[in-house]
Amino acid sequence: MNTPLHLENIKQAPKALLHDHLDGGLRPATVLDIAGQVGYDRLPATDVESLETWFRTASHSGSLERYLEPFSHTVAVMQTPEALHRVAYECVEDLAADSVVYAEVRFAPELHIDEGLSFDEVLASVLAGFADGERACAAEGNAITVRCLVTAMRHAAMSREIAELAIRFRDKGVVGFDIAGAEAGHPPTRHLDAFEYMRSNNARFTIHAGEAFGLPSIHEAIAFCGADRLGHGVRIVDDIDVDPGGGIRLGPLASILRDKRIPLELCPSSNLQTGAVASITEHPFDLLAWARFRVTVNTDNRLMSDTSMSLEMHRLVEAFGYGWGDLERFTINAMKSAFIPFDQRLAIIDEVIKPRFAVLVG
């Protein structure tokens, strides 16, 4: 007999997470604690509950640009090796507690050099935090694998340097590269040099595209930049026509995205907050899943969106009536799309994900 699809049961399901920002997932208590240690006095609240509420309400803005504003506070308390290590360590703990068995967590080193750290020092501190967190969770019987995506900000001019950083650390926990930030006015083709460098080194990358700006951003990311995955990509729905009888017709961009099995790192709650969708029930996740796009479930920013992988899955279950088989398919989609080697992906699918879902399905 199937285990009921309640939130508490979903928390027991194994999960694979591809799109999660380190600076968007801090514990409010940690933000307050580090702010006190480093003398940062610009926080909008002085107690945990009020600060948590502020992050959530400030981020629920209806636009991507306003959604990004609260990050100034989290980034401000992530400027020392100790703070970076702590935030990374706690990230691993929090994901493992939510039954995430594999995660790729991304962050932009260029945002963490205000106090004089080098890019290498910033990245080494985060990777050490991930590794120490993995060991601690494994010792408690809660194994998780966490790898890093190094992000460049699309409005800046450091993407080639950040891509080189990703390659320097490719054997130390970094599995790929990304660009992020406001899409409007900052097309991905401005960073072709970085993407060409990654390809020339046989390395993988994802691109934030189609979150707020629409089809042109997705087209550039795929046709000119050669993205292996799309961060969000939700606006691909603009290239899909649904006829009155329920059939669909894919435009050329949607067709190649589906045909090439390019993964979509979909983040439903975040899309609601930024105004990309009006409600979870109106999110195109279900249409894309039904049309057999490579859809994956992601958190984006756990603090700002007040979410977790379990909550994202539960919201989708409530909105679209998904069953355990659907959640397993989305999880395997994510694991297939991870940037670690094929044999490692297969091992996690066959030895962890499928057996644990089998218990839940009954």
From Swiss-Prot:
Zn(2+) binds at residues 19, 21, 208, 300. The keyword Membrane does not apply. One of its GO terms (molecular function) is 2'-deoxyadenosine deaminase activity. Coiled coil: none annotated. It catalyses: adenosine + H2O + H(+) = inosine + NH4(+); 2'-deoxyadenosine + H2O + H(+) = 2'-deoxyinosine + NH4(+). The record marks 232 as: Important for catalytic activity. This is Adenosine deaminase. It comes from Mycobacterium leprae (strain TN).
